[in-house]
Curated annotation (Swiss-Prot):
It comes from Burkholderia ambifaria (strain ATCC BAA-244 / DSM 16087 / CCUG 44356 / LMG 19182 / AMMD) (Burkholderia cepacia (strain AMMD)). It is an enzyme of class 3 (hydrolase). This is Undecaprenyl-diphosphatase 1. GO terms for molecular function: undecaprenyl-diphosphatase activity. Signal peptide: none annotated. One of its GO terms (biological process) is cell wall organization. Its main location: membrane. The gene is uppP1. It is found in: Cell inner membrane.
Amino acid sequence: MDWILICKALILGVVEGLTEFLPVSSTGHLIVAGSFLNFNDAHAKTFDVVIQFGAILAVCWEYRQRIVSIVTGLPSRPDAQRFTLNVVIATIPAIALGLLFEKKIKAVLFSPVPVAFALVVGGAIILWAEARQRERREPPRVQSIDALTPLDALKVGLAQCFALVPGMSRSGSTIIGGMLFGLDRRVATEFSFFLAIPIIFGATLYETVKDWQAFTVDSLGLFALGLVAAFVSAFVCVRWLLRFVATHDFTVFAWYRIAFGLFVLLVGYSGWLNWA
């Protein structure tokens, strides 16, 4: 493994870790970064899923005590059972639609115009949602993640389905959707983190089974480097985001999305971006 390949794996891991939990679309960033780094071989998709796994491990580590408490409390504690049920309910819609339309989504939406459009539209939705939040006089209805109802979870799960469109952002869809449905900003952010766990674990398992040939002796080292880079950067990002949402809104991410969407459109049609 040469040092250039090592640098590419580390850069992509950091990009994934920094963008997976921000409402900016990690998919769009990985496509652009992978193209500029000329990292678009046959197993690039598997590498992307592996580094996503590294990012979700960071969430598991950050919330390890709560996760252990939920798992051990499942047989007897109603709060643990209710929380688990909410995560399951919120996860089902995206998994069902993803399995049904995976091939069509890849065939139709993985090109510069749809991704750029999703980035810009997602940014506009965030601006609109934040304007609504500022106009509200009453506090958010759901002030604690334990106060979520199954109906709240279903609504957030339906919002997560928009993330099947490349460029829309899973975290953006769930956080902004949650806020629009009455969740406090921090509650929506934390619930989005927990929803990522089954989604990304499932995607990792699915891609591993589908492309097991990619896991060779030569590639394992590269995958491990990317995973570690994603873990570290995601851990830093998650902690930073939790502090950020306590005192800021998501307007800055909205304008960034719009600018990045226009950039994707520019590089896509200029020939600078090898869209794979």
